[in-house]
């Protein structure tokens, strides 16, 4: 079984979605069940509704799952596993207070050395601290694993100490709950971000202590860097939020296409998730950081907009009139996002705001003169744009840019865009909606 294990503590990050997509693809390729595990044991950081938001995003991306579990439902199992380790003398109670440990951390910092917990501290405050934590005994050997992307990764004994499994309130730590659940659900491969590399030896040690002889294969994905700063994209970067990208009018198909493409060797530029299942391979992923490029994502989104079928295009743009499909297709050629497309069609159909767009009083006057001339014309009477244009120029007594710029604004709501002869048939059939001024 493969799994995706998000925490409901904020907006879904593009790095997390990338991991979800890759786990889903490999599960399909290997014909294995796919598990979604909501890691909600950190009650203080959980945000109400974020779990549902995550699941909704996965559905939008075309990702389905065979099983959905909430990690908090397994807390009795986690405690049972901790008790097993205590009985087998593989774990121990630690009575050292948070204040004591903080002092030791500060001392290590001042001495410019890494902080490592010492087992001798476990009983120092036993008389005054009656709520101990449970720690796994530190290993006396190195822990190594062969990462599917990073190759061999090794942690020496002095890099690992006796770490906490259960907190004072008997709630499991992230690493303990994660390791226990991966055993419980027989997870065979974990694809996740490289920020989890330091967690991996701890989870391996927990699973070995619990008697696992069937090691999990790990693949740690390189981080995604911001295109401008070159730094890791954090939650503060709005483009790192999948929700933000969707709200900006990027299609789920395009986002998935992009996240599969970056840092990868792909056989074609534009593809669907189902197509990627046919050829995706972890071996083709680079071990170097991927660079986020919003401009390229916009290009891919433009290509996916063109691939939308008629019904989906009408649904996404909220247009009920099928006669406008051709116009939508013309507008798509100039749009990178669904938001831009919706804005163009809205400007076309809504009353025109010449007060907002006029450059000076003379320009406003020309707009009003041309508007009155157009109102007197029967749009359906002209066989083409050329004959319509000549009559409009005659009636308004305007020519050149004094004619064309006001004309474009009055007919499309925009000062530039698709050539007017191409959209004139749609202007003819919708002229009563098109030729209106905002009060």
Curated annotation (Swiss-Prot):
A motif ('HIGH' region) lies at residues 6-16. One of its GO terms (molecular function) is tRNA binding. It is found in: Cytoplasm. A motif ('KMSKS' region) lies at residues 232-236. It is an enzyme of class 6 (ligase). Keywords: Aminoacyl-tRNA synthetase, ATP-binding, Cytoplasm, Ligase, Nucleotide-binding, Protein biosynthesis. The lineage of its organism: Bacteria, Pseudomonadati, Campylobacterota, Epsilonproteobacteria, Campylobacterales. One of its GO terms (biological process) is glutamyl-tRNA aminoacylation. This is GlutamylGlutaminyl-tRNA synthetase.
